[in-house]
Protein backbone atom coordinates (compact mmCIF):
# COMPACT_ATOMS: atom_id res chain seq x y z
CA UNK A 1 0.00 0.00 0.00
CA UNK A 2 2.81 2.41 0.85
CA UNK A 3 4.92 1.57 -2.19
CA UNK A 4 2.09 1.47 -4.74
CA UNK A 5 -0.19 4.02 -3.12
CA UNK A 6 1.05 6.58 -0.64
CA UNK A 7 4.53 7.24 -2.03
CA UNK A 8 3.32 7.95 -5.61
CA UNK A 9 0.41 9.99 -4.23
CA UNK A 10 2.60 12.07 -1.94
CA UNK A 11 4.62 13.28 -4.92
CA UNK A 12 1.45 14.93 -6.24
CA UNK A 13 0.43 16.67 -3.02
CA UNK A 14 1.40 20.32 -2.94
CA UNK A 15 3.20 21.36 0.21
CA UNK A 16 4.00 17.81 1.34
CA UNK A 17 7.25 15.88 1.27
CA UNK A 18 8.19 12.36 2.30
CA UNK A 19 10.99 12.77 4.86
CA UNK A 20 11.05 9.43 6.71
CA UNK A 21 9.82 5.85 6.52
CA UNK A 22 9.86 2.97 8.99
CA UNK A 23 9.97 -0.79 8.55
CA UNK A 24 11.56 -3.56 10.64
CA UNK A 25 13.52 -4.51 7.52
CA UNK A 26 15.53 -1.43 6.53
CA UNK A 27 16.22 -2.84 3.07
CA UNK A 28 12.54 -2.43 2.27
CA UNK A 29 12.70 1.23 3.30
CA UNK A 30 15.66 1.79 1.00
CA UNK A 31 13.90 0.05 -1.87
CA UNK A 32 10.60 1.95 -1.71
CA UNK A 33 12.05 5.32 -0.66
CA UNK A 34 15.75 5.56 -1.55
CA UNK A 35 17.53 8.50 0.01
CA UNK A 36 14.83 9.04 2.64
CA UNK A 37 15.61 8.65 6.34
CA UNK A 38 14.74 5.11 7.45
CA UNK A 39 13.85 3.70 10.86
CA UNK A 40 13.08 0.23 12.16
CA UNK A 41 9.84 1.18 13.92
CA UNK A 42 7.20 3.85 14.17
CA UNK A 43 8.47 4.61 17.65
CA UNK A 44 11.99 5.35 16.38
CA UNK A 45 10.59 7.54 13.60
CA UNK A 46 8.36 9.51 15.96
CA UNK A 47 11.05 9.95 18.60
CA UNK A 48 13.46 11.32 15.97
CA UNK A 49 11.14 14.32 15.56
CA UNK A 50 11.57 14.49 11.79
CA UNK A 51 7.92 14.66 10.75
CA UNK A 52 4.92 17.00 10.95
CA UNK A 53 2.33 14.27 10.29
CA UNK A 54 2.38 10.50 9.99
CA UNK A 55 0.64 7.75 8.01
CA UNK A 56 0.39 4.46 9.90
CA UNK A 57 0.22 1.53 7.48
CA UNK A 58 1.47 -1.14 9.87
CA UNK A 59 -0.49 -4.37 10.51
CA UNK A 60 -3.82 -3.67 12.21
CA UNK A 61 -2.63 -5.23 15.47
CA UNK A 62 -0.07 -2.41 15.77
CA UNK A 63 -2.35 0.49 14.83
CA UNK A 64 -3.50 1.41 18.33
CA UNK A 65 0.00 1.26 19.82
CA UNK A 66 1.55 3.32 17.03
CA UNK A 67 -1.31 5.84 17.00
CA UNK A 68 -0.93 6.37 20.74
CA UNK A 69 2.78 7.10 20.23
CA UNK A 70 1.93 9.59 17.49
CA UNK A 71 -0.77 11.16 19.62
CA UNK A 72 1.60 11.58 22.56
CA UNK A 73 3.92 13.45 20.19
CA UNK A 74 1.03 15.66 19.05
CA UNK A 75 1.25 14.45 15.45
CA UNK A 76 -1.70 14.52 13.04
CA UNK A 77 -2.11 10.83 12.21
CA UNK A 78 -3.72 8.92 9.35
CA UNK A 79 -4.32 5.23 10.11
CA UNK A 80 -4.76 2.82 7.21
CA UNK A 81 -7.65 0.38 7.16
CA UNK A 82 -8.67 -1.71 8.96
CA UNK A 83 -8.65 0.91 11.71
CA UNK A 84 -7.80 -1.64 14.40
CA UNK A 85 -7.66 -5.34 15.12
CA UNK A 86 -11.15 -5.41 16.66
CA UNK A 87 -13.96 -3.23 18.00
CA UNK A 88 -12.40 -2.79 21.43
CA UNK A 89 -9.20 -1.42 19.91
CA UNK A 90 -11.18 0.75 17.49
CA UNK A 91 -12.96 2.31 20.49
CA UNK A 92 -9.60 2.91 22.17
CA UNK A 93 -8.25 4.43 18.94
CA UNK A 94 -11.15 6.91 18.96
CA UNK A 95 -10.01 8.06 22.41
CA UNK A 96 -6.51 9.02 21.26
CA UNK A 97 -5.78 12.74 21.22
CA UNK A 98 -5.37 14.35 18.79
CA UNK A 99 -8.08 12.25 17.16
CA UNK A 100 -6.57 10.04 14.42
CA UNK A 101 -7.91 10.06 10.88
CA UNK A 102 -8.75 6.84 9.01
CA UNK A 103 -7.76 5.90 5.46
CA UNK A 104 -11.20 5.21 3.98
CA UNK A 105 -10.02 6.48 0.61
CA UNK A 106 -13.10 5.45 -1.39
CA UNK A 107 -14.75 8.62 -0.11
CA UNK A 108 -12.48 10.57 -2.47
CA UNK A 109 -13.76 8.87 -5.64
CA UNK A 110 -15.37 11.74 -7.57
CA UNK A 111 -18.20 9.46 -8.74
CA UNK A 112 -19.01 8.52 -5.16
CA UNK A 113 -18.96 12.17 -4.11
CA UNK A 114 -21.36 13.03 -6.95
CA UNK A 115 -23.76 10.27 -5.91
CA UNK A 116 -23.64 11.26 -2.24
CA UNK A 117 -24.53 14.84 -3.12
CA UNK A 118 -27.77 13.57 -4.68
CA UNK A 119 -28.91 11.78 -1.51
CA UNK A 120 -30.81 13.88 1.02
CA UNK A 121 -29.68 13.43 4.62
CA UNK A 122 -33.05 11.97 5.67
CA UNK A 123 -33.64 9.81 2.58
CA UNK A 124 -34.60 6.14 2.75
CA UNK A 125 -32.47 4.44 0.12
CA UNK A 126 -31.34 1.08 -1.20
CA UNK A 127 -27.68 0.69 -2.14
CA UNK A 128 -26.28 -2.06 -4.35
CA UNK A 129 -22.52 -2.36 -4.32
CA UNK A 130 -20.50 -4.76 -6.48
CA UNK A 131 -16.70 -4.50 -6.32
CA UNK A 132 -14.29 -7.17 -7.52
CA UNK A 133 -10.68 -7.01 -8.65
CA UNK A 134 -7.57 -9.16 -8.91
CA UNK A 135 -5.14 -8.83 -6.02
CA UNK A 136 -3.32 -5.53 -6.52
CA UNK A 137 -0.37 -6.16 -4.22
CA UNK A 138 1.00 -8.68 -1.74
CA UNK A 139 1.50 -7.40 1.81
CA UNK A 140 4.81 -8.15 3.50
CA UNK A 141 3.50 -9.22 6.88
CA UNK A 142 -0.26 -9.87 7.03
CA UNK A 143 -2.72 -11.83 4.92
CA UNK A 144 -6.07 -10.33 5.89
CA UNK A 145 -9.26 -12.14 4.92
CA UNK A 146 -11.77 -10.33 2.73
CA UNK A 147 -13.76 -8.88 5.62
CA UNK A 148 -10.62 -7.21 6.95
CA UNK A 149 -9.07 -6.25 3.60
CA UNK A 150 -12.21 -5.19 1.68
CA UNK A 151 -14.88 -4.88 4.35
CA UNK A 152 -13.70 -1.59 5.91
CA UNK A 153 -13.94 0.38 2.65
CA UNK A 154 -17.30 -1.09 1.72
CA UNK A 155 -19.00 -0.73 5.09
CA UNK A 156 -17.71 2.83 5.35
CA UNK A 157 -18.91 3.55 1.83
CA UNK A 158 -22.42 2.39 2.73
CA UNK A 159 -22.49 4.54 5.89
CA UNK A 160 -20.98 7.59 4.22
CA UNK A 161 -23.16 7.50 1.10
CA UNK A 162 -26.40 7.11 3.02
CA UNK A 163 -25.51 9.18 6.12
CA UNK A 164 -27.19 6.33 7.99
CA UNK A 165 -25.87 3.91 10.60
CA UNK A 166 -25.78 0.15 10.04
CA UNK A 167 -28.14 -1.65 12.43
CA UNK A 168 -27.66 -5.29 11.45
CA UNK A 169 -25.89 -7.50 8.92
CA UNK A 170 -26.60 -10.85 7.31
CA UNK A 171 -23.73 -12.68 5.63
CA UNK A 172 -24.95 -14.61 2.61
CA UNK A 173 -21.52 -15.77 1.47
CA UNK A 174 -18.04 -15.64 2.99
CA UNK A 175 -15.23 -17.44 1.18
CA UNK A 176 -11.60 -16.72 0.41
CA UNK A 177 -12.68 -15.20 -2.91
CA UNK A 178 -16.05 -13.57 -2.37
CA UNK A 179 -18.26 -11.91 0.25
CA UNK A 180 -21.98 -11.26 -0.13
CA UNK A 181 -23.84 -9.26 2.51
CA UNK A 182 -27.27 -7.83 3.22
CA UNK A 183 -27.12 -4.71 5.37
CA UNK A 184 -29.96 -3.04 7.23
CA UNK A 185 -29.62 0.70 7.84
CA UNK A 186 -31.45 3.16 10.03
CA UNK A 187 -32.92 4.50 6.79
CA UNK A 188 -32.86 1.83 4.13
CA UNK A 189 -30.78 -1.18 3.25
CA UNK A 190 -27.80 -2.23 1.19
CA UNK A 191 -26.55 -5.25 -0.70
CA UNK A 192 -22.81 -5.64 -1.03
CA UNK A 193 -20.71 -8.10 -3.00
CA UNK A 194 -16.94 -7.82 -3.10
CA UNK A 195 -13.80 -9.87 -3.42
CA UNK A 196 -11.29 -11.22 -5.91
CA UNK A 197 -11.97 -11.96 -9.57
CA UNK A 198 -10.08 -12.34 -12.82
CA UNK A 199 -11.25 -8.92 -14.01
CA UNK A 200 -12.17 -5.61 -12.42
CA UNK A 201 -15.71 -4.61 -11.58
CA UNK A 202 -16.76 -1.47 -9.72
CA UNK A 203 -20.48 -0.79 -9.55
CA UNK A 204 -22.60 1.27 -7.15
CA UNK A 205 -26.33 1.89 -7.55
CA UNK A 206 -28.52 3.96 -5.22
CA UNK A 207 -32.34 3.98 -5.44
CA UNK A 208 -34.94 5.83 -3.39
CA UNK A 209 -37.85 4.24 -1.52
CA UNK A 210 -39.91 4.19 -4.73
CA UNK A 211 -37.18 2.27 -6.56
CA UNK A 212 -36.12 5.21 -8.73
CA UNK A 213 -32.42 5.37 -9.53
CA UNK A 214 -30.77 8.31 -7.76
CA UNK A 215 -27.18 7.82 -8.78
CA UNK A 216 -24.19 5.56 -9.00
CA UNK A 217 -21.70 4.27 -11.51
CA UNK A 218 -20.79 1.08 -13.31
CA UNK A 219 -17.21 0.68 -14.47
CA UNK A 220 -16.60 -2.56 -16.42
CA UNK A 221 -13.36 -4.44 -16.16
CA UNK A 222 -11.52 -3.42 -19.31
CA UNK A 223 -12.22 0.29 -18.83
CA UNK A 224 -11.23 0.24 -15.16
CA UNK A 225 -8.05 -1.68 -15.87
CA UNK A 226 -7.03 0.84 -18.53
CA UNK A 227 -7.92 3.86 -16.38
CA UNK A 228 -5.88 2.66 -13.44
CA UNK A 229 -2.82 2.20 -15.60
CA UNK A 230 -2.80 5.93 -16.27
CA UNK A 231 -0.46 7.60 -13.81
CA UNK A 232 -2.64 9.96 -11.81
CA UNK A 233 -5.71 8.85 -13.77
CA UNK A 234 -9.12 9.93 -12.50
CA UNK A 235 -10.11 7.78 -9.51
CA UNK A 236 -6.94 5.69 -9.65
CA UNK A 237 -5.69 4.57 -6.26
CA UNK A 238 -2.96 7.21 -6.28
CA UNK A 239 -5.50 9.92 -7.10
CA UNK A 240 -7.81 8.84 -4.27
CA UNK A 241 -4.87 8.98 -1.89
CA UNK A 242 -3.92 12.44 -3.15
CA UNK A 243 -7.33 13.68 -1.99
CA UNK A 244 -6.93 11.87 1.30
CA UNK A 245 -3.46 13.31 1.95
CA UNK A 246 -4.58 16.80 0.96
CA UNK A 247 -7.31 16.50 3.58
CA UNK A 248 -4.75 15.36 6.14
CA UNK A 249 -2.71 18.50 5.48
CA UNK A 250 -5.82 20.64 5.90
CA UNK A 251 -6.54 18.90 9.19
CA UNK A 252 -2.95 19.35 10.35
CA UNK A 253 -3.32 23.07 9.71
CA UNK A 254 -6.59 23.28 11.61
CA UNK A 255 -8.73 23.80 8.52
CA UNK A 256 -11.97 22.00 7.57
CA UNK A 257 -11.55 18.72 5.69
CA UNK A 258 -13.37 17.58 2.58
CA UNK A 259 -14.23 13.94 3.27
CA UNK A 260 -11.59 12.48 5.58
CA UNK A 261 -12.88 9.88 8.04
CA UNK A 262 -12.00 9.98 11.73
CA UNK A 263 -11.39 7.22 14.24
CA UNK A 264 -15.01 7.69 15.32
CA UNK A 265 -16.01 6.35 11.88
CA UNK A 266 -13.78 3.34 12.42
CA UNK A 267 -15.82 2.08 15.39
CA UNK A 268 -19.12 1.31 13.57
CA UNK A 269 -17.18 -0.10 10.62
CA UNK A 270 -15.33 -2.58 12.85
CA UNK A 271 -18.61 -3.36 14.64
CA UNK A 272 -20.21 -4.18 11.28
CA UNK A 273 -17.30 -6.44 10.35
CA UNK A 274 -17.60 -8.34 13.62
CA UNK A 275 -21.37 -8.65 13.09
CA UNK A 276 -20.72 -10.07 9.62
CA UNK A 277 -18.51 -12.75 11.18
CA UNK A 278 -21.18 -13.60 13.75
CA UNK A 279 -23.77 -13.86 10.99
CA UNK A 280 -21.51 -16.07 8.87
CA UNK A 281 -21.21 -18.49 11.79
CA UNK A 282 -24.90 -18.49 12.72
CA UNK A 283 -26.55 -18.05 9.34
CA UNK A 284 -28.81 -15.42 10.90
CA UNK A 285 -29.00 -11.64 11.03
CA UNK A 286 -26.52 -10.17 13.50
CA UNK A 287 -27.12 -6.81 15.22
CA UNK A 288 -24.49 -4.08 15.05
CA UNK A 289 -24.13 -2.49 18.51
CA UNK A 290 -23.88 1.29 18.86
CA UNK A 291 -20.83 2.39 20.81
CA UNK A 292 -21.01 6.17 20.47
Describe the residue ranges of each PLM region:
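N-terminal Rossmann-like dinucleotide-binding module
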Residues: 1-33
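Beta-loop-alpha module in the N-terminal Rossmann-like domain of NAD(P)-dependent dehydrogenases
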Residues: 6, 36-93
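Short, Asp-centered acidic motifs that coordinate Mg2+ and/or phosphate
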Residues: 20, 52-53, 126
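C-terminal helix-rich "cap/oligomerization" subdomain common to oxidoreductases
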Residues: 53-56, 250-292
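A contiguous active-site-proximal alpha/beta segment in oxidoreductase catalytic domains
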Residues: 61, 83-136
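Hydrophobic residues in well-ordered beta-strands that form the structural core
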Residues: 79-80, 102, 215
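Contiguous beta-strand/loop segments that form the cofactor/metal-binding neighborhood of enzyme cores
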Residues: 149-221, 243-255, 292
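Active-site loop of classical SDR/Rossmann-like NAD(P)-dependent oxidoreductases
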Residues: 215, 234-246, 261
Amino acid sequence: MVELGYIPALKKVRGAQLVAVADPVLERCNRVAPGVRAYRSAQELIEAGDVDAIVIATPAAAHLHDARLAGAAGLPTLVEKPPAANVAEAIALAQVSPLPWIGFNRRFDSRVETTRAKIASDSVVEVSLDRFHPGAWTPYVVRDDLLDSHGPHNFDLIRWLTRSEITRVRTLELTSQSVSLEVELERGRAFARFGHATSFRDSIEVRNAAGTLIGGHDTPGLFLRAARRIVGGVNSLAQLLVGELEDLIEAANGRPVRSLATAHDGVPVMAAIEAARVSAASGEWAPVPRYN
